[in-house]
Amino acid sequence: MVVLGIDPGSLATGYGVVSGDGRESFRALSCGLIRLHPRKSHAVRVGEIYRELSELIGELKPDRVAIETAFVGKNVQSALKLGQVRGAIMALSFNSGVPIFEYAPREVKSAVTGRGGAAKEQVAFMVASMLSLSSVPKPFDVTDALGVALCDLLRCGGGQKERQTDMKGSGGGLCGWGDFVRASPDRVL
C-alpha cells in the first residue's frame, strides 16, 4: 500500500509518500516541501499546491491520501486560508479517484511516538527511525507529512477490513481502534 501524507499550509505544504504493509516494513518513496512565495496571491499559491500534488499523484500513484486536520488558532484569516488549501487537496484527491483520510495531530503523534502530546522533535526522530532514514528530514512540515502517512498505514493500511470513505465526509476514524490493534499487535501492551 502506498500513502501520500500531507501537512497542509498556505505558505509551506509538506508531503511524504510512504509504502508499507501496516506493520513494520515502511519505506519512504518521496518527501519534500512545496514552498510558496508569500507575495503571490493566495489563489495562485493554492493553485501551485494543487498542481504540484497532482503531478506527484500522477507519478507515484498512491492508493490513499492522508491529510492532517486543521489546527485552528486565534487568527481567523489564517484558518480560512488553511481551509481553502485543505479544500483544494480534498478536491484533488476526489478528482484523482484516490480516497482521502483525515487524522488529528494528536492521533498522528500517538500513532508514531505512542504519545499524543509528543514534541515535533520526537515525531521527527521516530519518523526517521521507522523509515530507516540516515538523517531526519527537515523542516518539520516534511516529517509531519511522513508521520501522517505512517499513521494512516498503521491505523488502516495493513490490509485489514476497513470502511471506505464515499468522499462525502472525512475518513478520519473510519477504521477504528480495533482495526489498529489487529494491524499492529506489536504496538499494543
From Swiss-Prot:
GO terms (BP aspect): DNA recombination; DNA repair
Coiled coil: none
Enzyme Commission number(s) of this protein: 3.1.21.10
Gene3D superfamilies: Ribonuclease H-like superfamily/Ribonuclease H
MF (Gene Ontology): crossover junction DNA endonuclease activity; DNA binding; magnesium ion binding
PROSITE patterns the UniProt entry points to: RUVC (PS01321)
Protein name from the UniProt record: Crossover junction endodeoxyribonuclease RuvC
Source organism phylogeny: Bacteria, Pseudomonadati, Chlorobiota, Chlorobiia, Chlorobiales
Gene name of the record: ruvC
